[in-house]
Amino acid sequence: VITPASREGASRVRRECTASYVGDGFWLTAHHCVSQNPSMDGYLEQFDGQRAGIAGIYTLSDTDDVALIEVGPGIDADTFEVAQDPLDIGQQATLTGYGETHDYASSATTTIVAHRDEIDFGSAVYTDLFEALSATASRSCSGDSGAPVYIGSTIYAIHTGGGYNPSCVDGKDMLMWHTNIAPRATWIKSTIRMNAGLTESEESKAAAGLGAAPLDEPVSSDVDQGSNRPLTVS
């Protein structure tokens, strides 16, 4: 999200969330990452410095913490498969995201301990989530919202929230909540299918978002190894 830093019109970059590539120029993230500004001008940035401007944002509903971001060209990424079946209680998966204070991605093993029909987070009520615990000292922190919860190359959930942790402090057996992707898979696939390809106005919007990126050359940082890599939403 690009916000004015001064009356002279200068801008600063604020890294908000993490997103994962699901094909045809679309990236999956959390609804609460985009709900306050669904027409935002901005861009996505990958670990290697590749960037793509935001062309459009699609949401399912105010109670489904999922969103799709369509982008213009600029990023080469492997594609996550979208799960058709949910994770089971006791099953473990990997959560990989960008903490707000970090310039690199890190991973945590998350253990599913319960299914929650609804959770009131104060600012929003979201439905159909997994409740989970961090299996090791690695846990979620601010900036990880929208991050993939995956096994192999299949994404089963996206990270919605956890205990307050703005400084990204470690902690084992810490609570986290992830939005279940399986019941939203049909919406994800149909939205991509019906909106694949950029209109002229979407191309212009993507170019404007990319134009807001800093002029300095981004520096590649260490990230977790794997064929599918989440990136930050700016």
Residue ranges and their predicted role:
Residues 13-16, 141-145:
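Short, small/polar residue-rich loop motifs at catalytic or cofactor-binding pockets
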Residues 14-16, 22-64:
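Catalytic-histidine neighborhood of serine endopeptidases
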Residues 21-27, 145-232:
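C-terminal subregion of chymotrypsin/trypsin-like serine protease catalytic domains
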Residues 63-137, 173-189:
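Chymotrypsin/trypsin-fold serine protease catalytic domain
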